[in-house]
């Protein structure tokens, strides 16, 4: 079997940490990912980063509130939940 990582990255307009964490935790779980741990950092005066350790790889959130944008990135070594995540995200 060939080693492979599937990547999805996009900029979004939501920057509120609680909404981001709740929405993407649900999206990951509903797509079939197993969230093992979440590490969060709130920056002063503003900004937020969260890293989701998944049994299938990882997901990251980086906010840029001063620009009203957030960068999200999913890396997965398992195609099925990765495809479900993209489908669920786009719907």
Predicted feature locations:
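Polybasic/polar functional segments that serve as interface/processing modules
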Residues: 1-91
């Amino acid at each position: 079997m060939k080693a492979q990582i599937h990547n999805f990255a996009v900029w979004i307009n939501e920057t509120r940490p609680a909404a981001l964490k709740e929405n993407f935790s649900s999206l990951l779980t509903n797509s079939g990912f197993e969230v093992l741990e979440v590490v969060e950092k709130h920056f002063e005066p503003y900004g937020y980063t969260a890293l989701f350790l998944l049994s299938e790889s990882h997901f990251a959130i980086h906010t840029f509130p001063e620009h009203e944008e957030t960068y999200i990135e999913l890396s997965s070594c398992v195609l099925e939940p990765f495809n479900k995540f993209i489908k669920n995200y786009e719907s």
